[in-house]
Each structure stands twice: as C-alpha cells, then as structure tokens.
Amino acid sequence: MILIPAIDLMGKKVVRLTQGEKERKTEYPISPVELALKYQEAGARLIHVVDLDRAFTGESENFEVIAEIIKNVSIPVQVGGGIRDIESFRELIDLGVSRVIVGTIAVTNPELLEEMLTLDRDKVAVGIDAKNGWVAIKGWVESSNYRALDLAYKVKEMGVTTIIYTDIARDGSLTGPNFNETLKLAIDTGLKVIASGGISGLEDLRRWRELGENKIYGVIAGKAILEGKIDLKEGIRILEGES
C-alpha cells in the first residue's frame, strides 16, 4: 500500500476544498512545483494532481503548471479533474502523465471511456466520487443514478483496472475515511482501489495498514499533509510497512 500526496489546483495555485465546495476553499502559500518537489523529497512514489478549474468549468488554466510539475519531478504524476474529451486525454498523455483519471464520462459518455481505453488502457483510471453511496459528477455538483458499486462493476467490464474512490462527505474534512465502503468496493470488485477522502492523521493511516493490507492499493492525503496533521515521511513509513 502506498501513500499518495495530493495537489489540488485552482487558478494555478495550491488549494483544498472542503467536501468539494468552491466556497469552502483554502489557499496555500506554496507553488505547485515546490510542493511536488517536497513530496518527492519526502519519499512519495506517486503524486495525485486535481485540476479543479477544469472539473468545475471544463476549461483549464493549470495545464502549464501540470507540465512544470511533470518536468521537475522524476516520480509518476496522475492527473484528474474535468477530462471529458479525447483531446484533453491525449494532451495529458503526451505531457507524460502516468495515469489520467476520468469520472463524469464513465456515467455520461461510456463510449468516450471506451475510446480512451483503446488508445492506452494502462493510462486510464476512473474516479468514483460518492455521497451516501450515490455517484456525483461534474465537479460533484450533480448526482447520478448510479450506486458506487454498480459503476465500479460497469467500468471493470469495460476493462478499467484502477479506480480512485472518494467519499465526498469526508473529503477535506479531516474527519477520518469511510473505511467500510472503500473496503467493500475493493473486495467485491477485485479492482485496484485507491482510497481518497477524510484522512485526519497518522492514526487513520495505521488503520488503513491494518484493514487494507493486500486489499487497497493506495491512500490519497491532501489537506492533512498541507496542514501538518501528517508528516509525509512518517506516513509513508507507516503505510508502506517500515513501522
């Protein structure tokens, strides 16, 4: 199991939202590239980047920032947020992104997801963002008619092997992860699941280590690292088995 630090981008700046709400935004006085380098130096093996502008509006002003992050670090970078056309997918692949995370199109345009899988199956992951078990789309502002588990089974049939599961109610809240729902998704589907949302401190990582060993591929943490609730080096040691 690996600990994956997150960088959320809005207006070329590092931010965190609480429960995905634009109005509940915290800005951090560090450049995205500087933060990525700090994460790499602490021992991260993968960085998770979310383009919030594109998620909300479909337009991105963060492309150059993402390019700079990839240019400056030597570890893989996965990117998500509002990728709803094949051109955006190609652009990110050409940039050197290790994995592109799509969400909304898995619900609204499965044909496009098929096209992406045909282009480069290994570079596609699906983000399943759920509130009370129901999948939310378009930057979490709309609800869908899919239960999280049903969507996971559907994309698995299409050939997706990796999903990022976020419990929206926990995201950016520092209230602790939804262990049960995430584990159920991983065990029932057999997919490679990355857990996201709610990490509040090292105790949550110890719990993931205890419950998720050989079931969960990775855990994403953002706000807890930025606000000093988790020392990234120590978190990596706990989750990856050195303490």
Curated annotation (Swiss-Prot):
<dbReference type="GO" id="GO:0000105">
    <property type="term" value="P:L-histidine biosynthetic process"/>
</dbReference>
<comment type="similarity">
    <text>Belongs to the HisA/HisF family.</text>
</comment>
<dbReference type="InterPro" id="IPR011060">
    <property type="entry name" value="RibuloseP-bd_barrel"/>
</dbReference>
<keyword id="KW-0028">Amino-acid biosynthesis</keyword>
<dbReference type="InterPro" id="IPR006063">
    <property type="entry name" value="HisA_bact_arch"/>
</dbReference>
<feature type="active site" description="Proton acceptor">
    <location>
        <position position="8"/>
    </location>
</feature>
<dbReference type="Pfam" id="PF00977">
    <property type="entry name" value="His_biosynth"/>
</dbReference>
<dbReference type="InterPro" id="IPR044524">
    <property type="entry name" value="Isoase_HisA-like"/>
</dbReference>
<keyword id="KW-0413">Isomerase</keyword>
<dbReference type="GO" id="GO:0003949">
    <property type="term" value="F:1-(5-phosphoribosyl)-5-[(5-phosphoribosylamino)methylideneamino]imidazole-4-carboxamide isomerase activity"/>
</dbReference>
<dbReference type="InterPro" id="IPR013785">
    <property type="entry name" value="Aldolase_TIM"/>
</dbReference>
<dbReference type="GO" id="GO:0005737">
    <property type="term" value="C:cytoplasm"/>
</dbReference>
<dbReference type="InterPro" id="IPR006062">
    <property type="entry name" value="His_biosynth"/>
</dbReference>
<keyword id="KW-0368">Histidine biosynthesis</keyword>
<protein>
    <recommendedName>
        <fullName>1-(5-phosphoribosyl)-5-[(5-phosphoribosylamino)methylideneamino] imidazole-4-carboxamide isomerase</fullName>
        <ecNumber>5.3.1.16</ecNumber>
    </recommendedName>
</protein>
<dbReference type="GO" id="GO:0000162">
    <property type="term" value="P:L-tryptophan biosynthetic process"/>
</dbReference>
<keyword id="KW-0963">Cytoplasm</keyword>
<dbReference type="InterPro" id="IPR023016">
    <property type="entry name" value="Isoase_HisA-like_bact"/>
</dbReference>
<comment type="pathway">
    <text>Amino-acid biosynthesis; L-histidine biosynthesis; L-histidine from 5-phospho-alpha-D-ribose 1-diphosphate: step 4/9.</text>
</comment>
<feature type="active site" description="Proton donor">
    <location>
        <position position="129"/>
    </location>
</feature>
